[in-house]
Amino acid sequence: PDANAAFANIARTPFATSKTGIAVNYTPWLRDLSVNDVFLASLAGYYKITDGQAISLGLRYFKLGSIQFTDAQGVELQKYNPNEFAVDLGYSRKLGKKNSLGLAIRYINSNLAKGTFNSVNYKAGSSIAGDLHFYHHGAKENGQGLNWGLTLSNLGSKISYSSDATQKDFIPANLGLGLAYTKVFDESNKITFALDFNKLLVPTAKLDSLSASGQRIPTDASLAKYRDQGVASSWIKSFGEGGGINNEIQEVNIAIGAEYWYNNQFGFRAGYFYENPNKGNRKYFTVGAGIKYSVAGLNFSYIFPTGSGTSRIPLSNTYRFGLVFEMGGKK
């Protein structure tokens, strides 16, 4: 694991082979829509206090570009530059030789709008959330074997963008399970196959009305009842909504991937992400490559265009660039 574990599963960090790690990532966003001023950037790092303990820090910043606000009649009001950021602080430690546990706390700031529009005072939203991560390291000393992890992430308070106390919404809490098996052929060649499952722990509002365009939407009463639910109880209710087991299966996103490394210096990756058509219908292929030299590593990935017309995903043709540094020798 490298410093990017701060965003996926920090319980992996105590098994890192270097004492200190840093990761920097940059992703131009929505380039397929000819948007040039939107990007996602992240910075992460870890420090191993002992062989079995580590602390980690993560920072994510999302710049949404310049947006022109209008009123209900389409009259231009003002331009605004929305942005969001999250700061994570985590601690992880080994539980025996093969298991580990990680805890993280996160501050979220979502500055989408400010000012008064249509008699409503809008402000930046904020929330405090936490993560609980578990990791099992089943690989042998040469790296071959099965590793897996379980995560409960973004468990936190509701967020609101106005002075109206009834307009608070749930943040996207998530349950994740990931597995990765590595086959080592010799000292120069190895390949890893990975499989991830993710489910949002957020209930669905009852869609008991129709919009002017014929879309199913919640009534004001249903939306108020939905927002009135407690945070902790909403995580449980996200499993017991209408539709039975078939609905629960549809809510699980699936991602598969493979990574090949030659001489621990040159890496090649490919993956596929699937989301049920009734739950968002995101489907795309990815490819990537990595190169390591001394303490530094460079990573690159690309999302292939998928779909057409209204079904084309906005993230088509998205590139991601990353730098990884591992320092301090072995710990």
Where are these regions (language model features)?
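Subset of outer-membrane beta-barrel
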Residues: 1-331
